């Protein structure tokens, strides 16, 4: 999974940017290039040797022309200035590198040493490689990116339909107070899969730049509420009460680091289970955060107060408007919104 800090750097060379135009022109002319992005060139006097000082306005055309010389080009990080051209970059030779070509070995060492962006264009393979800190990202062809994104969006649509169906089924069980841990874990796992595909797709969309505008809108529409729903599910079903920040951290752990399984998700939620078959036998009760937020439009900050008083969704559903009004932050309007939203859901489920 591509880390967010690297995604921000990939944006610098996405189609539609001036730097990408320069890189594409360099490849079309069958040139190579080594480009170093810095905040203050004077800080790197021991690394930047030879060449000549320009300190001129940045443009794609200038970068292309300067790439005709053998040396590297030094640009400002905000891509407004060209500082140096035709320089020799001398990073610490003891820094390990897995690259073979001279240009790419220099780029990798320089990025590791300085923590800055270094871009290498291979003359022989016509490939753009971006190095940043200890990361390396090889830029993909637009046709390949479009194909990958289209396939991912199609997969996401199916996963989102399944996730919505599981949430709908869970809602029925919640209102009937017969949710099992298996129901919760199944829903969470589908949501994690959905979010993982989203995170894997995001770098491709970023790399597409202007070409990825439609895909970016589709991705946002498909997943804009999934993160919030997952956090609310974790808050609803953790064996011990957790706040929103803790639930978000648990979710990120599932999405970015853990290989989620029914057992691992159950244990993180606080349930001591040894076998998957146990999940069907463990009855759990929702606290009500998700219903309060999504159906009654009650802010989380007020939802805490409701859950603190009534403990579970089942108890909230049995409370009268007058009972609900005793909660701090709940007036007549919000009390009716909670009561009516629960009644409406029960009525809708009964009539289906």
From Swiss-Prot:
Q: What are the protein's UniProt keywords? A: ATP-binding, DNA damage, DNA repair, DNA-binding, Magnesium, Nucleotide-binding, Nucleotidyltransferase, Transferase
**Gene3D superfamilies per the UniProt record, alphabetical:** 5' to 3' exonuclease, C-terminal subdomain, DNA integrity scanning linker region, DNA integrity scanning protein, DisA, N-terminal domain
Q: What class of enzyme is it?
A: transferase
Swiss-Prot/TrEMBL catalytic activity = 2 ATP = 3',3'-c-di-AMP + 2 diphosphate
Q: What is its EC number?
A: 2.7.7.85
Q: Which domain of life is it from?
A: Bacteria
Q: Which PROSITE patterns match?
A: DAC (PS51794)
The residues listed in the UniProt record as binding ATP, with positions renumbered to this chain, are 71, 89, 102-106
Biological process according to GO: DNA repair
Q: Which InterPro entries match?
A: DisA, DisA_sf, DNA_integrity_DisA_N_sf, DNA_integrity_scan_DisA_link, DNA_integrity_scan_DisA_N, DNA_integrity_scanning_protein, HhH_motif, RuvA_2-like
GO molecular function list: adenylate cyclase activity; ATP binding; catalytic activity, acting on DNA; diadenylate cyclase activity; DNA binding; hydrolase activity
How is the subunit organization of this protein annotated in UniProt? Answer: Homooctamer.
PANTHER family per the UniProt record, alphabetical: DIADENYLATE CYCLASE, DNA INTEGRITY SCANNING PROTEIN DISA
Query: Briefly, what is this protein's role?
Result: Participates in a DNA-damage check-point. DisA forms globular foci that rapidly scan along the chromosomes searching for lesions. Also has diadenylate cyclase activity, catalyzing the condensation of 2 ATP molecules into cyclic di-AMP (c-di-AMP). c-di-AMP likely acts as a signaling molecule that may couple DNA integrity with a cellular process.
What NCBIfam families does UniProt report for this protein, alphabetically? PRK13482.1
Q: What is this protein called?
A: DNA integrity scanning protein DisA
Q: Report the source organism.
A: Thermotoga neapolitana (strain ATCC 49049 / DSM 4359 / NBRC 107923 / NS-E)
